[in-house]
């Protein structure tokens, strides 16, 4: 994933860009630290293929009644079942959550790549978004797919020829893939979209309806004085010891813990 976002490459570090933060542009003034606000949260929003109804759509319909009052929606992972493949996005994400997508009424012809949301929709990848199929499983799933569709089983194993490409499909849908930009376009892109400022660093500006890419597979944003951390726990490993950002992150953690104790 680091290659996809050009992690800490000179073009970004020389501009002081923090690739783990984003600032959300809001239509109205953000509420203050003492003000209440609402947000939506969901996870594991999929299943295998159902013939007569769509569990993801039923979830989305329950959330729709609260959409207009919510500041943002957090998705805690397993965005697209069963294996996060590109051909599963239409029925398992685009169709169910079309009201959150710009031009969502055109979901049938919409690509899963470079999605744009009309309201902050902030996911992290789950294990299903990283799934890949071994060759034997892919062959069995692919060869039996026409038969399974013909039989119209009530509940089917939603798998075909492909998996997620080790999260590549998720990345194409939600993450700002800087590796896809030619070097001549990269500078313009960074100046246009990484123009927000946070504690002395530049970061990605999230603009609903325009640019709703995420800077990384894990990230942080702030709303009404509340810091929200989105962590991809699929790839957690033993810490490598001291890092350049370690002291500042430890300081931020101590400050947050102190605030919690004082409230």
Where are these regions (language model features)?
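Conserved hydrophobic/aromatic beta-strand scaffold that supports enzyme active sites
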Residues: 218-220, 228-230, 255
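Short active-site segment of divalent metal-dependent hydrolases/proteases
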Residues: 47, 80-81, 129, 227
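Active-site-proximal segments of metal-dependent phosphoesterases and phosphodiesterases across multiple
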Residues: 235-254, 258-263
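Second-shell loop/turn segments in exported
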Residues: 46, 78-83, 242-245
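Short glycine/proline-rich turn/loop motifs
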Residues: 45, 73-76, 230-241
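Acidic, histidine-bearing metal-coordination/catalytic regions of metal-dependent phosphoesterases
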Residues: 1-72, 87, 91, 95-125, ...
């Amino acid at each position: 994933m680091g290659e996809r976002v050009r992690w800490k490459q000179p073009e970004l570090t020389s501009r002081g860009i923090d690739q783990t933060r984003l600032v959300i542009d809001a239509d109205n003034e953000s509420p203050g630290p003492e003000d209440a606000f609402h947000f939506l949260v969901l996870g594991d929003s999929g299943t295998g293929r159902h013939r007569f109804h769509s569990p993801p759509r039923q979830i989305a319909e329950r959330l729709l009644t609260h959409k207009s009052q919510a500041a943002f929606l957090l998705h805690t992972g397993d965005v697209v079942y069963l294996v996060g493949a590109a051909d599963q996005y239409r029925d398992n994400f685009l169709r169910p959550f079309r009201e959150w997508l710009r031009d969502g009424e055109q979901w049938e012809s919409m690509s899963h790549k470079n999605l744009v949301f009309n309201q902050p929709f902030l996911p992290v990848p789950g294990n299903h978004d990283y799934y890949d199929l071994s060759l034997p499983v892919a062959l069995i799933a692919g060869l039996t797919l026409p038969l399974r569709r013909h039989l119209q089983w009530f509940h089917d194993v939603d798998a075909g020829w492909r998996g997620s490409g080790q999260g590549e499909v998720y990345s194409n849908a939600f993450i700002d893939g800087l590796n896809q930009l030619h070097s001549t376009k990269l500078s313009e892109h960074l100046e246009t979209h990484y123009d927000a400022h946070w504690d002395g660093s530049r970061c990605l500006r999230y603009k609903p309806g325009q640019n709703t890419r995420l800077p990384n597979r894990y990230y942080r944003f702030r709303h009404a004085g509340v810091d929200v951390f989105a962590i991809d726990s699929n790839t957690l490993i033993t810490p490598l010891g001291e890092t350049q950002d370690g002291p500042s992150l430890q300081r931020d953690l101590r400050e947050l813990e102190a605030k919690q104790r004082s409230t």
